[in-house]
From Swiss-Prot:
Enzyme Commission identifier(s): 4.2.3.5
Protein name per Swiss-Prot or TrEMBL: Chorismate synthase
Function of the protein: This reaction introduces a second double bond into the aromatic ring system.
Reactions catalysed according to its record: 5-O-(1-carboxyvinyl)-3-phosphoshikimate = chorismate + phosphate
Residues bound to FMN: 124-126, 286, 301-305, 327
Family stated for the protein in its record: Belongs to the chorismate synthase family.
Quaternary structure and interacting proteins, as annotated: Homotetramer.
Keywords: Amino-acid biosynthesis, Aromatic amino acid biosynthesis, FAD, Flavoprotein, FMN, Lyase, NADP
Cofactor binding note from Swiss-Prot or TrEMBL: Reduced FMN (FMNH(2)).
Length: 362
């Protein structure tokens, strides 16, 4: 319950942060897709902990094992199972949270719902759950690149009150990965890194915004009413840990425009594809992709687990204080970039198969 996502291109993730491992079962991947396992590992390397001075110091290789569904480098069309073993757990760092709820963390709500919780490491609420999503998203990415040349690139747009202005039409993954904060604006990236370090040294945390662009998306993805493409994109990225907001296209800023200013005028094209003079719609109209770049933004809250002492209650409902130990990101955004890309790729792959199944018979 609650650990599966997708309709035809469907994933189910499993595992806890301090259990034996985490992983995913992917169903619905088309057969005979030439799969590059190094590309899967590369995405996990972008997500893994301990990669820089502004991420958690937990050391995990996050080496993926493909257990089924692939033979001689080709997908079989059968379920693809992948697992990553946990190696660097420290349950002793979580003694305090075994009896006191972390403010704004899932501890209290998991306990209220289930009457039990995996408090060491956060269990299913830990960002380690996203390993399976990133691995499956890497397969979706390869499928979309092969079929349509689709390119999904995300980057850190804002950290705290520092915001970068990035041209979504030209930004490259190489520019994003050129620094540890994953902001393609080098000058702003340096300021963001300094800000994260300063806040982390104070025992605190900060949030921000990730922006993501889909270039060369397939046309016609999405369905009317409840399965609109932007609705599924919102559900996908909002299921990631620490997310608190979603925008597409002009987003909330579009409310300041008049219809005559906001409408994307259609233009003639030589190839018969839809072209627009602007892209306030963010590449989706009526819930269906129009072929223009899809542009979304995702807000991430400050990391809930911090070293600063906070007011809370214990498991008996009594007032107490908590200064959390353990190894935690002072800011989740640098490692969340591949997570956002993965969820976008998964949604697009799923809707592509649904589009092919319904609308490509004749």
């Amino acid at each position: 319950m609650g650990s599966s996502f997708g309709t035809l291109f469907r994933i189910s993730t499993f595992g806890e942060s301090h259990g034996g491992g985490v992983g995913v079962i992917l169903e619905g991947c088309p057969p005979r897709l030439e799969l590059d396992p190094l590309a899967i590992q590369a995405e996990l390397d972008r997500r893994r902990p301990g990669q820089s001075k502004i991420t958690t110091p937990r050391k995990e290789a996050d080496q993926v094992e493909i257990l089924s569904g692939v033979m001689d480098g080709l997908t079989l069309g059968t379920p693809i199972a992948m697992v990553v073993r946990n190696k660097d757990q420290r349950p002793q760092d979580y003694k305090e949270v075994e009896v006191a709820f972390r403010p704004s963390h899932a501890d209290a709500t998991y306990q209220a719902k289930y009457g039990i919780q995996a408090r060491s490491g956060g269990g299913r609420a830990s960002a380690r759950e996203t390993i399976g999503r990133v691995a499956a998203g890497a397969i979706a990415r390869q499928m979309l690149q092969r079929s349509h040349g689709t390119d999904v690139v995300a980057w850190v747009k804002r950290i705290h009150d520092l915001e970068a202005q990035v041209d979504a039409s030209t930004v490259t993954r190489e520019a994003v990965d050129a620094n540890i904060v994953r902001c393609p604006d080098a000058e702003m990236a340096d300021r963001m890194i300094d800000r994260i370090e300063a806040i982390g040294q104070d025992g605190d945390s900060c949030g921000g915004v990730i922006e993501c662009v889909v270039r060369r998306p397939p046309v016609g993805l999405g369905m009317p009413v409840f399965d609109k493409l932007e609705a599924d994109l919102a559900k996908a990225v909002m299921s990631l840990p620490a997310t608190k907001g979603f925008e597409i296209g002009s987003g909330f800023a579009g409310t300041l425009l008049r219809g005559s200013e906001h409408n994307d005028a259609f233009l003639p094209s030589d190839d018969g594809r839809l072209r627009t003079a602007s892209n306030n719609s963010g590449g989706i109209q009526g819930g269906i992709s129009n072929g223009e770049p899809i542009v979304i933004r995702v807000a991430f809250k400050p990391t809930a687990t911090i070293r600063k002492e906070q007011q809370t209650i214990n498991d008996r409902g009594e007032a107490t204080t908590l200064a959390a130990k353990g190894r935690h990101d002072p800011c989740v955004l640098p490692r969340a970039v591949p997570m956002v890309e993965a969820m976008v790729n998964l949604v697009l792959a799923d809707h592509l198969l649904r589009q092919q199944g319904q609308c490509s018979l004749w």
